[in-house]
C-alpha cells in the first residue's frame, strides 16, 4: 500500500486540481470568433452575466478574451467555442481551459491589426473597408494581443493577427477605437513557429521524469514563497541524462514554453573561443543575461563538451571553464529566479564537483521508454497523420523494443513515405498540383508500419548489427525437447512476466548449448530470437580480443550495455570456448587478456539488472575447457546437450532442408534417415545440397543439348517444345550424392561428449530419487523422470545403444 502511495506522490504534481472554473472544450454551435457559451447554471456559479467579458486561459500560457453567452443545451462542465478561439488558446476539443471574469477590460484607444500573407494572395483593394470595418462595427468585440481571427467577406476568408493593443494586453474595439492596418502582411512561417512551440503534451514516455522536472522547475519559478515558508533553498540545477533521442532537449524547451520563463540556450561547443579568457566571459554573459530577464531557465546542451573531468583533460581552457561554471552556480543569488538545466548522454564524463547538491541537485535519468511510453510517443507522432482503420498502435508499441522517441518518429515518417511510394503511379511529378482525390486516398496502413519496422532499428544498437533473424522453428528438424526448453527460457519471461511475479521467481539468465559440430546450435539461437521477436546480438568470440590493453574488457562492457538498452535481447556467444577458457592456464597471452575478459563477462552476467530481459546463449563444441565459474547456476545455468540426431530427427532435418525443393515420389527420406546413422545435421544438409546440385547440373546440360538440337533442325523447332527434362530431384540424384556422403564427427568425439554429459549428470542430478517424508505414494510415477535435457538416458540419443 505504501508503495502505491509513493507512486501517487511522485506524480502528484501532474494531477490537475478540480475547480469550478475549469471547463472542457466543446465545438460551438454558432461560429462567432468573440463568443463562448456556458450553461446558465455554470454562469450563476461563476457569478457571470450574459454579455460579460471573460478571460480564458489555455495551454502554454496562452490566453484570450471573449464575450460569454448562456446556452441551455450546453452541459454544466463544458464550454463551447469555435476553432479560432481554440487555436488562440492552443487547445483541442475535450481539453481543459479556465474561465475568469474580466471586469477591468477597457475600450481600446488604438489597435494594430495585420493580415497573414498566405490568406491575402490574389486579394486587392482596401482590406479595412471590406473586412475589418464591418467585422468590428457589428459588435463590441474584445481582442487580446497575439490573437488570430478569420473574417469572411467578399467570397473568401482572410486571417488577421492582433499585433498591438492600447491599453495592453486586451481591450474592447468600440466605434471610437482607431484601427491601424498598414504594414507588410505577417509571414505564415513566423506565425506557425510560435504555434508549433513544444508543450508538455508533446512529450511522451517519461511521465515520472516530467513530474520530477515540474516540481524542480515550476515550483521555484512560479511559487518561490513555498520554499521560503518551509525555510529551504529552492533547487538550482537539474542534470538530465540518457541515451540520444529520448527527448532531453525537447523537455527543456517544453518547460520553458509552459512556464513562460525566459529561455537561454547554451550549446556546449559554442562557448569555446580561441582567445584566452573569452570562453569564460561568454559563460558569465549568459548568466548575466538570464539574471536580467528572470525568471529564467539556462539550458546547457551537451554539457560534457564544456565540463569534462578536470583530471582527464589536457587543455587548460576546459579546466577554467569548469571552474567558472562552478563559481557561477555557487554565486547565483538566492532571490534570482534562475534555474540551470543541462543535458548529456555521458553523465560519467562530467566533472564530479558539478554533481553535488547546490549545483546540479537532481539527476534525472530519461531512459528508453517501455511499451506504455512508446504508445504515448506514437500517439503524439501520429495525431496529425491520416491513419487507416487497421492501424493498431498498441501492437506497434509492443513490438518496437528498445526504440526511443526519435526512432519512433523516424518509424512514423518511414511508414508515411511507404504509403506515398505505393501511390506513386497516380502522382505525376511534372504536374504543379496533385489531384485532390489522390491526396484524399492517402492513409497510412498497418502494412506500411510493418514495412517501416523492418527498416528501422533502435538507435542504441546502430553500430552493433542487431537483426531479428528470419529462422523459424520449421527450419530446425527434430530437437523437440530442446525447443520446448528454450521457449520456456526466453519466450515465457517476455510474453508472461506476470506469472514470474506471481510465483516470486526471476527468470533464468542463460543457456549453454554443447555437442558435436553441425547439430544446429547456432540455428537454435537464431530461431528463438525470431520466435519471441527479441533483438539478437551475435558476438563472435575472437572479435572481442584486441591488441590494446583494457580494450577487450571495454568491448564486453559495451556489448552488455547495448543489450540492456535494447531489452528484450538475446546475446549469442558463438564458440564460447575461445573467450571463456578455464583461467590460469593461459600463460603468456597478452598479459592475461583472456582471463580479464572472462572476469568481465562473469561480473556483467551477475550485474544484469533484474528488470531487463537479457538472455545469454552460449554455444561450444569444447565444453571441457570452459571455465567452470561460467557454468554455475545464475549465469549459464542450463546446460543443454545437443546430440547427434536420431532416426526421427534425421528425417525431420531432411524434410526441413527439402521443404522448398521439388521431390520425386520414389525418394524415401525415411530410408535415407535410417542408413545415415551417426551423421550430424550439417552432414545431412550437405547430402541434400549435393543432390540438388546434381539435379541442377543435369537440367543445365539438358538445356544446352536442347539448344544445340534446336539450332541443328530449325524447321521443326516448334514441335520440340516438350516438358522440363528434370522436373524434380530423383532417387538417382540421392544415390549419386550418397557416394560422397561422410560423417564429420567420429565415434571417439561422441564418446567424449557422452562422458562429459554423464559426469554433469552425476554431479548435478544426485537427487533423482528425492522425496519428502510421508509423500512416497503421491509421486511414485514421476520418480524416474529425468530432466528433458539429460543426455545420459539412451532415449535421447540411441545412436550407440
Curated annotation (Swiss-Prot):
What SUPFAM superfamilies does the database record attribute to this sequence?
ADC-like (SSF50692), Cdc48 domain 2-like (SSF54585), P-loop containing nucleoside triphosphate hydrolases (SSF52540)
Q: Where does ATP 2 bind?
A: 518-523
GO cellular component annotations of the record: autolysosome; cytoplasm; cytosol; fusome; lysosomal membrane; nuclear membrane; nucleus; P granule
Record PTM Phosphoserine, positions in chain:
716
**Enzyme kind, highest EC tier:** hydrolase
Molecular function terms, GO-annotated: ATP binding; ATP hydrolysis activity; polyubiquitin modification-dependent protein binding; protein sequestering activity
Start and end residues of each stretch annotated as Disordered: 764-801
Q: Which residues bind ATP 1?
A: 244-250, 345, 381
Keywords, in A-Z order: ATP-binding, Cytoplasm, Developmental protein, Differentiation, Hydrolase, Nucleotide-binding, Nucleus, Oogenesis, Phosphoprotein, Transport, Ubl conjugation pathway
- Chief location of this protein within or outside the cell: cytoplasm
| Bias-annotated ranges (Low complexity) | 776-785
Tell me which Pfam families the record gives.
Answer: AAA, AAA_lid_3, CDC48_2, CDC48_N, Vps4_C
Q: What does the UniProt record say this protein does?
A: Necessary for the fragmentation of Golgi stacks during mitosis and for their reassembly after mitosis. Involved in the formation of the transitional endoplasmic reticulum (tER). The transfer of membranes from the endoplasmic reticulum to the Golgi apparatus occurs via 50-70 nm transition vesicles which derive from part-rough, part-smooth transitional elements of the endoplasmic reticulum (tER). Vesicle budding from the tER is an ATP-dependent process. Involved in the ubiquitin-proteasome system. Important for oskar mRNA localization and/or anchoring during oogenesis.
For this chain, the family text in UniProt reads: Belongs to the AAA ATPase family.
Would you tell me the protein name for this molecule? Transitional endoplasmic reticulum ATPase TER94
Per UniProt, what is the name of the gene that codes for the protein in this document? TER94
